[in-house]
Amino acid sequence: ISVRDTQTIDLDWGGKLVFVNSIVGGAIDARFLPAILKGIMARMEQGPLTGSYARDVRIIVYDGKMHPVDSNEISFMLAGRNAFSTAFKEAGPKILEPVYDVEVSVPADYLGDVMSDLQGRRAIIMGMNSEKGYEKLLAKVPLKEMSSYSTSLSSITGGRASFTMKFSSYEL
């Protein structure tokens, strides 16, 4: 594929879109490329998989057809939108889940119960250490599992434990 032009666009919702023009022989007039891009971006913004934004995508436009009378911007915008939807689904996209580093300070008496609760939340225990009569648990936990953790931790320990969390990564 011969690359004629490449645009890298920073997306408002994070990530990038790389748009590559590899059209040869005038199969599609260059004036319709912005309409194709607009259709693709509209579909990316709607989220073709779960309703959440698609990001970090490379699009290569290499062929197409025009009609001297019926070709217009709306037709190419819809074509870009539909082509993106089809290609996106065929690519087998994966949904990434936000995972957080969680640090729990807990009295030693409650350590087992707190560890059991964390493991029930799909936590991966990364380590432990003792500090001033408290055990410090380090774990990686999916954000989805942390919605009621404060209440649960307080209930398990009688309000004697605390925790902090910060974003770590996105994982499958």
Question: Which positions does each model-derived feature cover?
Answer:
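Accessory interaction regions appended to the cores of large information-processing enzymes
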Residues: I1-L172
